[in-house]
């Protein structure tokens, strides 16, 4: 069995956040779900996070700007989630510090496939 990942989920849509959290927890991961970028920026445990899974369309800041601000404080594997999947959107995610761009809606298996290749940062 693989080592559980510590995942910070940044998603303002409550139903989506709950669905993703339940799936990830069922897969054995530890999930902390927060609704906005300001809450993410205020966390003092970013160095202990293995994965940041963030929506791009947050209410207070777009996910690209958020990742630029978070990246100096964490080496976590970062996955952008967006309804936009054009080449320009994907390139913007990568340029902002994300390692992967997941297009919504997605099936849970697609997320687990990405996570399968992520190594825990500090176990």
Show which residues each predicted segment covers.
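Short amphipathic alpha-helix used as the core "switch/output" element in two-component signaling
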Residues: 64-75
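Conserved acidic carboxylate
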Residues: 11, 35
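Charged docking surfaces used in two-component/phosphorelay signaling
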Residues: 18-26
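C-terminal output helix
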Residues: 106-115
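Active-site beta3 strand of CheY-like receiver
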Residues: 47-53, 58
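The feature encodes the CheY-like receiver
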Residues: 59, 86
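Acidic catalytic/metal-coordinating carboxylates
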Residues: 36, 62-65
């Amino acid at each position: 069995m693989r080592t559980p990942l510590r995942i910070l989920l940044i998603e303002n849509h409550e139903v989506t956040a709950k669905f993703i959290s339940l799936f990830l927890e069922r897969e054995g991961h530890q999930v902390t779900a927060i609704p906005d970028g300001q809450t993410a920026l205020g966390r003092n445990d970013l160095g202990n996070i293995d994965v940041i899974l963030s929506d791009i369309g947050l209410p207070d800041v777009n996910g690209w700007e958020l990742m630029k601000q978070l990246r100096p404080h964490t080496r976590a594997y970062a996955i952008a989630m967006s309804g936009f999947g054009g080449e320009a959107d994907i390139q913007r995610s990568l340029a902002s510090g994300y390692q992967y761009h997941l297009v919504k809606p997605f099936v849970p298996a697609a997320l687990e496939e990405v996570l399968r290749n992520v190594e825990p940062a500090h176990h």
